């Protein structure tokens, strides 16, 4: 149920895997198997209640890490990834949440989706980690490209430069941990940071504030851990 990014990507994945499936527009009645609810966060709880009431033999799966719902037939399958309609789900590791149920997990494995069972409900810190990993990265990448373009770089060159820096930075930190953190804050170069802060302030005071807060946090983090 649902025709957004996750719903479409999931439907395409199941079809390619030759798993029998169909898209439904409303809660079915007296069905069995697995119903995937790829709907907005606000719609998850009422739909879960309706689906489980009308279908005693069904397992319901939703994708909203911010939604908690207590039932031995309701599960959260969280992608911990940025999904669009063309995403290849066979490359994504999902986290599975809910009451431990080996028979349901066997059914889910038959779909070909990769997942790891993580417990009853995710904590707010789990979701905060996803926000930091995904949304923060997306936001700062877009801002970094805009800064390059405002300095005269083309959109194409800006994207190539930012992409290679992001990818190499992630490679370094995954390989070397805190030793892979580079840049003026990691080196304690406060004069450079101050100069860049004031330059940013002339363009966007809010962004400059985020820039300063992030660099202050990096400086403290590296100092405490090294």
Locate each region found by the language model.
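Rossmann-like NAD(P)(H) cofactor-binding subdomain of soluble oxidoreductases
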Residues: 8-12, 27-88
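Glycine-rich adenosine-cofactor-binding loop
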Residues: 1-14, 188
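NAD(P)-dependent Rossmann-like dehydrogenase/reductase catalytic/cofactor-binding core
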Residues: 18, 159-160, 164-226
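A generic structural motif
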Residues: 17-24, 56-57
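Rossmann-fold dinucleotide-binding core
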Residues: 61-127
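Active-site rim beta-loop-alpha module in soluble metabolic enzymes
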Residues: 105, 111-153, 159-164, 171
